[in-house]
Amino acid sequence: MAWSQSARKPMIGLLFRAQQHSARGYSYSAFQAHLSSSNVDQSATLLRRFSSEVPASEQMNLIKQLRERTSAPIKDVKASLVSCNWDIDVAQKDLRKRGVVLAAKKSSRTAAEGLLAIAQDEKRAAVVELNCETDFVARNDVFQYLASSLAKLALSARDPGELVFPFGPDYLENLNVNLDHPKLSGETTVQSAVTEVAAMVGENVKFRRGFIMSTTAHGVVCSYMHTCPQPGLGRLAGLITLEAEDSNAPLDALQRVGKSIAMHIVATKPLFLSKELVSASAVENERDILRTQAESSGKSQMAMEKMVEGRLRKYFEEVVLLEQKYVVNDSTNIKSVLNDLSKEVGSKVTVGNFARMEVGEGVSKA
């Protein structure tokens, strides 16, 4: 065999040098240490010689193929191929093992970038947030595919039986997901899929949260995604359910107006649906702030009270959806838009629920 023949000459040389060292008074232990060191050097030389037997053009081709299969960094791809004697299948398994270890090491790093993904049918919509460390990874097709897959899984999971159902990672992480992407395929758990993608992209990747919104039999779920790299993905999401009292009301009109209001929600960030739903403590806190501001004006008590009430109305216009000026036409408000829609469909239309979500909100980036 070529290996044993190529190793024979260096061994003869080693024995010859050992005899010389012995004649010069070297100890047995010193000779052993020298021999062990020389053997390691010779083995490394043989491995390099074996690796170099793969032509440079074929090495580049193997690196390209493994890079396409895994999306791993080129330096890691080459290192695995070299350590696995350029066997691409063995190297792919080696890369996966390395990636899982590296992903675990990076799991404590802040992941405040990423994407929202939405999946919906006529009566329900599911939104999930998948985080990473940089917007560069958020543009990665494997990352985007995983985000979309998680949204579809959330929508197909058991019906929670609630009109609005927020959930954390534990709701999905142990469920199986079927993946069909050139670089990410097969059936695995959500937790394993997230770890595998983290290994591919070289960043901390986390499934953070999500929610499911449902409507009644005579309603629609409407959504809007902002800054979309592709349909169903974005950095901001607005959702709203509109419900008609009459079951014969045309739902396409509700969808048309509802989508526009969902866009409005993304732009204006409402906190409450109606004035009645603003907590008494929130109103009183705002009133105290406005009263303190009015006192510095030096006006009479009656004038200051009028100032406070006027500014309180302005506060409601800022945080209450029904009182907000419509971004599409600021000469009217959302309440008037719904009144006009009710006349159009011949049935009273009301808002069931609404939600707004943004990537990374509430995550400390320090």
Curated annotation (Swiss-Prot):
It is found in: Mitochondrion. Transmembrane segments: none annotated. Residues 1-50 form a transit peptide. Signal peptide: none annotated. Associates with the EF-Tu.GDP complex and induces the exchange of GDP to GTP. It remains bound to the aminoacyl-tRNA.EF-Tu.GTP complex up to the GTP hydrolysis stage on the ribosome. Belongs to the EF-Ts family. This is Elongation factor Ts, mitochondrial.
